[in-house]
Amino acid sequence: YCTRSWTIHSVPRLTKAKRLMEKLKELLNRECDRTMSSEEWDALFKLSTQIVLKKGDVLISPGDIEPDVYIVKEGIIRGVDFNGDQERTFCFGLPGTVFNSRFSFYRKLPSYYQIEACCRSVVLRIPREDYIAMTDECHSFAVWALHYAWYEQFLEEDRESTVHNGNAKERYIHMLKTRPAIANGVSQRIL
């Protein structure tokens, strides 16, 4: 028989949605050499709307002016450019990847690239004006965005020096070694 009165403190449990958002913040903080606090990421996410894409859905089409910024929350996104009827995958985006049409974002020009879902994917869409306003109003976000842009430049050169060199077998082996989630989650035709 127990006479002691016990107080039970409940430990708050994160819902699946909150766990997913915490994981997304962690991934974004690994995207470059600067990080932001959970609250700062929440401020950015509040500016976004969520878009659910099915495999093959096109988010940005060549010729469209689409200046907004996107963050991959779930799934795999790919960037495609065209030489006539021939398409070439030039990049993939996994959760935590930030992307946009650089032509549209910076100069309000039609997009050169096509951005599409490789599988069921969820992206967060942040209007360009809100993204720019946040860089004006939040120093830590502005620093993060600048370092992310520099990281994107690094990745572009890295892609040219590795992924776009060699024969198909060598490129596939490189993909298996460096980005197995893409090799396992995308059809072989796209790779």
Outline where the language-model segments fall.
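Cyclic nucleotide-binding regulatory module and flanking cytosolic helices
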Residues: 16-49, 104
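Generic detection of short hydrophobic beta-strand segments and adjacent strand-loop junctions
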Residues: 51-53
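Short, structured interface segments that constitute the first stable element of a domain
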Residues: 20-29, 40, 107-137
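Short, low-complexity, intrinsically disordered N-terminal modules
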Residues: 11-13
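Polybasic "coupling" helices that flank or enter modular domains
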Residues: 116-191
